[in-house]
A protein has these predicted regions:
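Hydrophobic beta-strand positions in extracellular immunoglobulin-like domains
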Residues: 61-65, 122-124, 140, 184-187, ...
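Secretory targeting and sorting signals
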Residues: 1-35
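Short beta-strand elements of extracellular/lumenal beta-sandwich folds
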Residues: 42-69, 168-194, 331-365
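A surface/secretory-pathway sequence property marking extracellular, secreted
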Residues: 35-37, 68-108, 152, 157, ...
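Acidic, serine/threonine- and glycine-rich low-complexity intrinsically disordered segments
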Residues: 229-361, 366
Length: 470
């Protein structure tokens, strides 16, 4: 067996590193190892395998080491007797019911924090039936570290168990390009799946092709859902695919990274489509059809990175779509008499060709903008999606949507700010004096350094002027 890696790399690896870092904090990893001491831990999640006759499932045994001398994982398989067997890579040593594995050979020996995984293939024994369970004990030990001891449960289920093998990525694509995401799956359960339902979710910049056995519906954030029902049997151990995959086009509003997610499940027993989403068939198109894969099911099992229900998911990434991005700050004059109440209208418009979502904005919110209130103007009411900003010795921080502040932060109330869209808010204000400094609406937060970049910096800030009426 060889260790498996997810098909997505850049963004996927970043997410994995973040997740692992969070796990290490939960496990109690030291921020910095003490001189002369090491740290070594392992993690094997619980696994569900099919009953007797199922081909088995691969599960990663994760290892985390820091300054560890001679780190190794010792796995005790005694608790599996009568229920399941476990197969380890050739670089592990087996003695009776005990298996000892060093760090995986692909782990960088010079890394300050070493992270890797040991693939373990669990197979049901003859006579294993739904409801059976067993326990695997393991110890992470090193010559200069305290041992870490844990267990994992191996449960036996009775049914089909589809694993999605359809992930992938391309580095770059242009608007108008036609691409396809692979559709490939295997059944690691002990019963045949009679038909398969695949649910696709496309990001805002992707347009799906038309298929006669699929239903289409719009989702929030300008995304698209496509549900396809495919006939055909997927027997235990079989790997199936769709020739040509799932086609889609890079739309005119695509920008930076785009993605297509897919979820597979047995067609028998799949829930009815939610009526509130308004799924509809499209006219024309051909049918998506399953066929046996040219890759053997055994290899597919080894390459499966996870084998819990989460393995029904796969993602296809387009890392970069060159397109224009240009947000423009908007402001209208504050008009009224001294002592009178009026409004301060501020906002932002997407005048570029590409859609912007909350991930690609880099701010956790889509299209945040900042309002500096003109001198001689007092805010009396604050619109939704806006909060006051205050300056301290450590910088600026946001507070509640309180009146009376001199700075406010606002954001578009959506996960996607599409090309051509405009969002504006109205502050209730009172003009208290004349002749003060103008305010501003800016895409950059207060401070000496810019926080926003797009294709045209000249329209990222606009003045808020006060016009006095007699």
């Amino acid at each position: 067996m060889r260790s498996a890696r997810r098909p997505h790399a850049r963004a996927g690896r970043a997410a994995v590193v973040l997740a692992v870092t969070a796990s290490l904090v939960a496990l109690g990893a030291p921020a910095q190892a003490e001189t002369g001491s090491g740290w070594f831990q392992a993690q094997l999640d619980d696994v569900v395998i099919g009953a007797a006759g199922a081909p088995g499932k691969a599960k990663p045994l994760y290892v985390y080491a820091q300054d560890a001398v001679n780190p190794r994982v010792v796995v005790d398989l005694t608790g599996l007797l009568g229920v399941a067997s476990a197969e380890f890579p050739a670089w592990c040593a087996t003695s009776g019911t005990q298996v000892t594995c060093p760090l995986p050979p692909d782990v960088d020996p010079d890394s300050s924090l070493q992270i890797g995984s040991i693939p373990v293939l669990f197979r049901p024994l003859a006579g294993a039936s739904g409801g059976d369970s067993a326990t695997v004990s393991y110890r992470a030990v090193a010559d200069n570290a305290d041992p870490f001891v844990a267990t994992a449960t191996v449960s036996v289920g009775d049914g089909a168990d589809l694993v999605n093998l359809g992930g992938g990525r391309v580095d770059t694509a242009a608007v108008g390009d036609l691409l396809s995401a692979p559709i490939r799956l295997t059944n690691v359960g002990n019963r045949t799946s009679r038909g398969v339902r695949i649910t696709f979710t496309l990001s805002s910049g992707l347009t799906p092709s038309t298929w006669s056995n699929c239903w289409y519906a719009p989702l929030t954030g300008h995304r698209t859902s496509v549900v396809c029902d495919l006939n055909g049997r997927v027997r235990p151990g079989a790997t199936m695919e769709v020739s040509g995959g799932f086609g889609f086009e890079i739309g005119g509003s695509a920008y930076a990274g785009e993605s297509l997610d897919q979820f597979v499940e047995p067609l028998t027993g799949a829930a009815a489509l939610p009526t509130q989403l308004g799924y509809q068939r499209r006219e024309g198109g051909t049918k998506l059809r399953l066929r046996p894969s040219r890759t053997t099911s055994a290899a597919a099992r080894v390459l499966t990175p996870e084998i819990d229900p989460g393995d029904n998911w796969a993602s296809f990434y387009v890392d970069n779509v060159p397109n224009s991005l240009d947000l423009a700050a908007l402001a209208e004059p504050v008009v009224g008499p001294v002592g009178g109440s009026t409004i301060l209208r501020a906002g932002v418009r997407n005048i570029g060709a590409g859609d912007l979502d909350d991930f690609r904005s880099g701010a956790g919110e889509v299209a945040p903008f900042y309002v500096r209130v003109p001198s001689g103007v007092t805010v009396e009411s604050v619109p939704d999606r806006c909060v006051a900003l205050y300056e301290s010795e450590d910088g600026w921080y946001s507070g509640e949507p309180q009146p009376g502040a001199s700075w406010y932060r606002c954001a578009v109330p959506s996960s996607v700010f599409a090309a051509g869209e405009t969002y504006q808010v109205d502050f209730g204000v009172r003009i208290t004096s004349v002749g003060g400094a103008a305010g501003a609406v800016s895409l950059n937060m207060p401070g000496p350094y810019p926080s926003w970049w797009d294709d045209d910096r000249d329209n990222d800030e606009v003045a808020v002027v006060v016009q006095i009426q007699s």
